[in-house]
Amino acid sequence: MAHSPSRVFAALSPSAGDVYRDENQSVFNRGRKQTHLSAQSNVRVIEVTGCAEISSPPDRACVSISVKNSKENVNDVTNSVTRRLEYILQTARQHDVKEENITVTKHLQRDEDLFHMQAEVLVVFLDFEKMQQARTVLIEKLDKSVCVGDPYYSHSAESLSLLRRRVCLEAVDNARLKASEACCTLGQALGRPLLVREEESREWSSSQQDASGSPLTLHPRTDATLISATSRMFVTFELRPKDNNRRKF
């Protein structure tokens, strides 16, 4: 989690329109806030920024399984590839893969006296442990005409959307905590939020290989496909005097 260091400026006289400002905000942004709050001239406010950073691991793994064979008779080559495809599909279903996460592609061609058939199965696993179990079964049980590829880890649209919401909400919570602590120091009470605005957001993903360029092992490879997101939120809170215990400056 990333926090931005800041100091809070305070107008000490309790006149209308007092504003407690976070030093991090730009002059341009200050002008925008003052304009926004001009209609609430009797409201004292405190303005802060809050930052957050969250990383999310992949939630899906795609495995490509290819089958190829060549025979003089078209029925023979078709039957040979089909039997292996059926075993691959059965194995995927036994490891809780739904039909919508399985894609099968076939290609048949003739080269002089031989018929060549190729097929590819793309399987999307949501359970990484079962993915490894399924790969092990296929590698052990099928011959060299079947090639089981390495898993490719990725993030679903749903997990990315959740990541963006989480980092935004955490940045707002950090801003609220910062404002609350500043109010305690100043002998004031934190009121309701008057303005919330996201000032910056970024996302980035890690490399799938280490610095030396060599392939990573299974667990580091999963970690290496992390997607990280940061958010910086600007929040304006109403500032209220503490009941029965207002500090004198």
Swiss-Prot record:
GO terms for cellular component: cytoplasm; nucleus. Transmembrane segments: none annotated. It is found in: Cytoplasm; Nucleus. Signal peptide: none annotated. GO terms for biological process: immune response; positive regulation of canonical NF-kappaB signal transduction. Its main location: cytoplasm. InterPro entries: IRAK1BP1 (IPR030312), SIMPL/DUF541 (IPR007497). Keywords: Cytoplasm, Nucleus. The keyword Cytoplasm applies. Coiled coil: none annotated. Belongs to the IRAK1BP1 family. May be part of a signaling pathway that leads to NF-kappa-B activation. This is Interleukin-1 receptor-associated kinase 1-binding protein 1 homolog. It comes from Danio rerio (Zebrafish).
